[in-house]
């Protein structure tokens, strides 16, 4: 009899088989489920504290997604040969899992919950993120922890006009969309996507399709819970102290309503702080027994009620706008004088200083991902320091939120970037948020597009982004355009849409409540399009098209094509030739396997010099052409002349002069620069040269050209074997001269050979 009480559920999901197991691995966790989708295997565990910490006023949920390199049969490349800090992909996947499960824990549940997911086996054609979301949903469901799930999740592609469920890496290369949707059986909770300028209807159809497919996983999880679920915790939220709530409401409501009539964020924030302090002072004066943390939570609830009721009643929003108006926009380009491209994008009290930098192929980010190595030549980094919200805080490592916002902005812009052939630069965009009052990630999208255009990046179209919000009470709802920070906190949805005039390039949605219908999403998308087109109009006024030239401070890229067989000559033995080229010309040189060479330099003269030298190195010796080069070696039977870098030819003693030459050194010295004509080349690449062919024949006493000298007569042989009269017979070469010539010529070429990757 086995020591394990193992329960397994198998179901077919599209063209993939999914196996869920629990009861064998990680039995001491509150809940643990192993999910296998066509050899991609993830282990999700969840552990929850039995009680909340005293004074806890928020839900402490932590999600850690971890990829193990052994899952792909690899050993980590770091010095310590073990997994270290989370990669960007691991951080983004952790956020992807966190977002749909967080709203499903009941209000008032403040027990610490830690979700850990390990990817332990990877099929590159099956993404681990979807398997991880299914596994986490199942682990939470079987754990007995208070959780209003399960959730389902699915990836949706759009190929040849049809939606595709969970496309793999290969299929996604032909997909116009990469969308991940998660939700409960009844409602969508989270959407994350990028697209190739698709319409609102196509995007909404993908969300609906993905949600329907996610229900298949939800049904299987219900079956697993029936067979292996643990008893549900006997947890009840703390009873509400209605008299105390009424007291706080009486003290605070009027002051809070007055504060929310103030249109300026800073003044409003100050008024809210004063209202909070006043309530606490009044409670102290009355001798009430209270917890300050609970009072702050009550004040937040009162604020939410005030703001939400005003909006649903058709009253102006916090800053005085109606539900459809975008805040005032101001744009300034070329803000920073020495950067390659920059833009300052301000929308109300949200401001982004966005800077673009152009680099060479060497500057591209090389990522050793679990599914395989790849190169990324477009990077978008988002930073938001504490001063952006007028707060004191710590500056340190990049936060998860910053990584997530940067990736969203990147998703929005990547669809309109030029191809590598059209624009071979590596591009890095950095968005510095200098003010924030809602939708800073979408300000980063707008500023990023403008700064790249300012840098001379030939974008296919302008891209703008907008953040939408939602207030919903029963059957009444209001969709808000361009939400403020307070509206984000107090509302029910954060819905970000980016795109061009032609369609959507990125969509992100986080919903805090159940009951968001397809109709509400349609209204939100239509309203977002209206706002997006308005912002695009402002951007086009500020910068109609990209600059035609890159900045004088940016490297200029010059491309040339050589015979791939000549690559080793350009690199040289141990990289000696290319190293000398880059050092002596002050350029960066990149060589592709197909023979494409890219030269990068801020000085066109230096780039031209590098190009000239590469042309010399790779040039072929032409028969009949005259070259000028130094004597590199004197031989008994002639001399080696350098014609091109790495290419020497043999000047035979008989081809030095018209007269008889007894000693080569009487005519030539090493280092002497001479002009020679190429007589012939053979199949082995040996080159025969002549100086004599470029010299006039000396005149005899009669004024006629002197007859050519004859060699030793020896055996005269038959008449037919003799040369015609006046024709010169070449001197016989010493034995082995041909082999010496081959050896000497190959020596020079050999010095420039080397491995391409040296």
Swiss-Prot record:
Catalysed reactions listed for this entry: RNA(n+1) + phosphate = RNA(n) + a ribonucleoside 5'-diphosphate
Record domain KH: where: 555-614
Any one of the GO CC terms: cytosol
Ranges of biased composition (kind: Low complexity): 736-745
Keywords assigned: Cytoplasm, Magnesium, Metal-binding, Nucleotidyltransferase, RNA-binding, Transferase
The keyword Cell division is assigned to this record: no
Region annotation Disordered: where it falls in the sequence: 692-758
The enzyme's E.C. designation: 2.7.7.8
Residues reported in the UniProt entry to bind Mg(2+): 488, 494
UniProt cross-references to SMART domains, sorted A to Z: KH, S1
Disulfide cross-links: none
GO MF term set: 3'-5'-RNA exonuclease activity; magnesium ion binding; polyribonucleotide nucleotidyltransferase activity; RNA binding
Named cofactor requirement(s): Mg(2+)
Domain S1 motif: 624-692
Location of this chain's protein in the cell: Cytoplasm
Composition-biased stretches (Basic and acidic residues): 707-735
Entries under PANTHER family matching the protein: POLYRIBONUCLEOTIDE NUCLEOTIDYLTRANSFERASE, POLYRIBONUCLEOTIDE NUCLEOTIDYLTRANSFERASE 1, MITOCHONDRIAL
Alphabetized HAMAP family for the sequence: PNPase
Similarity comment text for this entry: Belongs to the polyribonucleotide nucleotidyltransferase family.
Record's function text: Involved in mRNA degradation. Catalyzes the phosphorolysis of single-stranded polyribonucleotides processively in the 3'- to 5'-direction.
Protein name, as recorded: Polyribonucleotide nucleotidyltransferase
Organism name: Paracidovorax citrulli (strain AAC00-1)
